[in-house]
Amino acid sequence: MYAAPVALLGLPETPALEEITFELQFGNSTIPFTKNIIYKFNDPVKGEVYRPLEVLPEVTASIPEKVLIFASDEAESVSVIVRAGKDNISGNVSLEHPEGWKVTPAQQAFQLERNGETKTLNFKVTPPKGQSEGFLKPIVSSEGKTFDKELVTIDYDHISYQ
């Protein structure tokens, strides 16, 4: 379950992670002011677009279907989308699952050439006999590091990009 830090509750948008402080000196007086670090690019439709600087994981993984219901105890296919956060990344994806559930294959390899590239991997998930509930979570191992985050982008004209 997602839990937001108490300091962020009630804020209209998430504060920028990176800021820079400038100090203007006029004679003997110094005036400091702080600005967010932003990224500016040109969009053919929207014109100049300003976005906050983002520090993202090297790779993210998500399960597109947020709720899965297994009507029987037969195996069903579960898709995992792996997204590169940098160029030339490879590794293995596995599914963390509840006790008694079975996932095949246990892990799958992936290779992504470009930042932003995605690849869909399919796992067969078999629930235990009888009723059970739990969470499936994709775990990515790459270059000796473990990643378990999903990238969710909020991008609407009437809501600030987050």
Spans of features found by a protein language model:
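Short beta-strand elements
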Residues: 29-62, 146-162
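Beta-strand-rich binding/interaction modules
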Residues: 1, 18-25, 77-83, 87-101, ...
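Helix-enriched interaction subdomains in cytosolic or periplasmic regions
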Residues: 120-162
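Surface-exposed, proline-enriched loop/turn segments that connect beta strands in immunoglobulin-like
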Residues: 64-66, 105-108
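Membrane-proximal interfacial segments on either side of biological membranes
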Residues: 7-34, 38-45
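Well-ordered beta-strand positions in beta-sheet-rich domains
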Residues: 30-34, 92, 107-109, 120-122, ...
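Short, surface-exposed loop/turn segments at beta-strand-coil junctions that are enriched for proline
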Residues: 1-14, 27, 111-115, 126-132
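Short, solvent-exposed loop/linker segments at the N-terminal edge
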Residues: 67-74
